[in-house]
């Protein structure tokens, strides 16, 4: 063998090892994402959103552009129940720190909903679950104390899906908390009417 042939042989061997290594890595990643998906779906099926959070975070590390799983992550943050709630008998500093952690969680949920619900609406404007995602986004804004924005999102949710009649109930509650009694009364009536229409339809 001349030097050129030996060099080419070595180069091909190195390339084959490199390609095999990449292929093995890709296969391992695929196996992990499949296992994570199964775990996430299983937990959400039994309303264990909080337990799904670490699996969702790992899944999104591996697949950063997965729109649906970003929405599931936002939902899990909205529903999470493992954060310590401030108690009246605790020191003020502890209560403040706990409140900040809770607020940070809801702020992240609302940020994720905003980015991904709007993207979903852009790429799949007729998605049957779009109204439901707007509904959850509205709650995250409510819990982030963005009440006016929450009202607009609840209105959008029920416009997209008329079955989300509780949107009217939530809007009425929000208007009451803002001291806008006339608007609250209007939406209480809308809620009652929408509920009655749903019952008649069933």
Pin down the residues of each PLM region.
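N-terminal leader/linker segments that initiate helical-solenoid repeat arrays
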Residues: 22-63, 68, 72, 82-91
């Amino acid at each position: 063998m001349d030097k050129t042939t030996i060099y080419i042989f070595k180069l091909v061997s190195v390339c084959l090892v490199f390609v095999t290594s990449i292929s093995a890595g890709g296969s391992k990643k695929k196996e992990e994402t499949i296992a994570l998906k199964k775990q996430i779906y299983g937990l959400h099926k039994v309303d264990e959103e909080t337990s799904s959070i670490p699996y969702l975070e790992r899944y999104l590390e591996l697949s950063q552009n997965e729109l649906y799983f970003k929405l599931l992550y936002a939902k899990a943050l909205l529903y999470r129940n493992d954060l310590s709630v401030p108690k009246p008998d605790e020191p003020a500093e502890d209560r403040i720190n706990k409140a900040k952690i809770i607020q940070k969680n809801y702020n992240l949920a609302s940020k994720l909903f905003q980015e991904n619900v709007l993207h979903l609406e852009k790429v799949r404007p007729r998605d049957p679950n779009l109204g439901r995602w707007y509904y959850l986004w509205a709650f995250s804004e409510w819990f982030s104390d963005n009440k006016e924005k929450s009202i607009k999102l609840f209105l959008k949710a029920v416009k997209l899906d008329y079955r989300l009649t509780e949107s009217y109930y939530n809007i009425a509650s929000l208007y009451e908390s803002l001291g806008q009694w006339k608007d609250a009364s209007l939406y209480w009536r809308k809620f009652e009417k929408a509920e009655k229409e749903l019952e008649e339809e069933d």
